[in-house]
Amino acid sequence: MKFLVWGLGRSGKGALKLLKERGFEVYAGDDSQNPELWREVLGEVDTVVLSPGIPPSHPLWKEALKKEKEVVGELELAYRFFKGKVIAITGTDGKSTTTRLTYLILKKFFDEVFEAGNIGKPFSEVVLENPEGIAVLEVSSFQGKTLKTFRPNIGAFISFSVDHLDWHPSIEDYLKSKYRIFENQTEEDFLILNDLVYEIKKTPSRARKVLFSELYINSDSVFYKDIRLFNPKNLKIRGLHNVYNASVASLIALTLGLKPEDFEEVIYEFRGLPHRLEFLGNFNGVEVYNDSKSTTPHALMHALKTFPDNSVILIVGGKDKGADFYSLRHIVQKKVKIALAIGETKEKIKDSWKDITEVKTCNTLEEAVKLAREVSKLGNVVLFSPACSSFDMFRNYEERGEKFKELVEIWFTRT
C-alpha cells in the first residue's frame, strides 16, 4: 500500500513517522510548502491521510473521493496499529477537561495509560511509543468525520451545540461526524451519553448505555443509580457543567472496575486546565476569570451560569463561525452587567443583545480589558469567555488566553 499524508503539523508528522516505521511507502506535503504535490501523486496512492484542520471542501479531499481513494485522518490511521483499550470522549464543550480528569484517575491505578487526540498529543505518537495499554482520547468532529474502523471500548458523548459550521457543510454533517465515533461499537463496549440532550440521546450504537438521566445530583452528593460518586462541594473546578464532566470521568473509572473511594481524591485535587474558567485572582474585590477555551455560545452559557446575577462584566467575541448569539439573550440578561464585544462578531453580538444589557464594542482585547478595569466595582466578576474561535486575532485559544492574562497583569495589578 502507498499513502499520501497531507498536512505536516504535529499530527501529520506523527502519521508520517508511524507509516515509515511500519515500512510503507509514503508521500507527504501540505498547502504551505508544496501545494501542488498531491496532484502529481494522488493517482499512485491507495490511502490519503488528512490532518484534522483540512476541511471537506479542500480540493484534495474532493479529488480523492472522486478517484475512489480511501480518505482517513491521523486518529483512524493510528487506531489501526493500536492493540490496547481505547476510551473516546467527545462533545462540543467539556471534552478536554473530561479527558484530562479521566487520564489522571486511570494513570493512578493502571500501568501504561496515555492521553492523546485532540487534546494535544497525536495518537500516532502514542502508538509509536507503546501500541498497547489504555489510550484516553479526546476526539473532535474533524477527527470523527474521517473514522472508518475506529471502535472505542468506552465512549462518552457529553455535550452538543451547533459549532464549526465554517468547516462542516451543515449541522447534520457535524452531528454525523460525532456519531461516527461510536458506530462500530458492539454489545461488549460501553457508551456514556448525555441523554438530556436530544441529539445525543439518539446516538446510534450497539454498546451498553450509561445515561446522564441515571445520575442524581444534590448539594453534597452525586449518585449513579445507588452508587455515590463524589461530593460536588469538594470540586475545585467551578460550574454544574464541571460536575457532569467529573461524573463522566467517574463513570469511566467505574466501568473499568474502580470504586469511588479509590479515585475521589483525584477528582478533588484537579484544578482544571488552563483557559477553562481559570481563576486569575481577586483584585480589590473584583474576581477575574480566563475562559479563552470558550469557543461556542454553549460554552459561554455554562460559564455565565457559574456566577451571581447581574455581576458579570463580560469580554466576548472573536471569529464568526455562524454562531447564534440571540439564543443567549435570557442568560445574558440575567447575568451580564455590561458586555464588551471584540473581534469579527462584535457588531453581531451588539445587535443581538443591545436591548437587554449594555454592550460596548472594542477594537482590541487590550481595549476591552482596560475598559473592564474602569467599569468594574466591588463584587463584580470580569469574565473573558469569547464564545468564538480565535483565528481572527490570534493563532489559537491558548495564545488568546495568555494575552488576556498578560493584560490582566498590566491593567488589574499595576493600576
From Swiss-Prot:
Reactions it catalyzes: UDP-N-acetyl-alpha-D-muramoyl-L-alanine + D-glutamate + ATP = UDP-N-acetyl-alpha-D-muramoyl-L-alanyl-D-glutamate + ADP + phosphate + H(+)
EC code(s) of this entry: 6.3.2.9
GO terms, biological process: cell division; cell wall organization; peptidoglycan biosynthetic process; regulation of cell shape
Gene3D superfamilies associated with the record: Mur ligase, C-terminal domain (3.90.190.20), Mur-like, catalytic domain (3.40.1190.10), NAD(P)-binding Rossmann-like Domain (3.40.50.720)
UniProt cross-references to InterPro entries, sorted A to Z: Mur-like_cat_sf, Mur_ligase_C, Mur_ligase_C_dom_sf, Mur_ligase_cen, MurD
A GO molecular function held by the record: ATP binding
Hydrolase is among the record's keywords: no
Pathway(s): Cell wall biogenesis; peptidoglycan biosynthesis
The entry's keywords: ATP-binding, Cell cycle, Cell division, Cell shape, Cell wall biogenesis/degradation, Cytoplasm, Ligase, Nucleotide-binding, Peptidoglycan synthesis
Compartmental location: Cytoplasm
UniProt GO cellular component terms: cytoplasm
Enzyme class (EC, first level): ligase
Binding sites annotated in the UniProt record for ATP: G91, T92, D93, G94, K95, S96, T97
UniProt main location, coarse: cytoplasm
Free-text function comment from the UniProt entry: Cell wall formation. Catalyzes the addition of glutamate to the nucleotide precursor UDP-N-acetylmuramoyl-L-alanine (UMA).
Similarity comment: Belongs to the MurCDEF family.
PANTHER family hit by this protein: UDP-N-ACETYLMURAMOYLALANINE--D-GLUTAMATE LIGASE (PTHR43692:SF1)
Name the UniProt record assigns to this protein: UDP-N-acetylmuramoylalanine--D-glutamate ligase
Species for this entry: Aquifex aeolicus (strain VF5)
Species lineage: Bacteria, Pseudomonadati, Aquificota, Aquificia, Aquificales
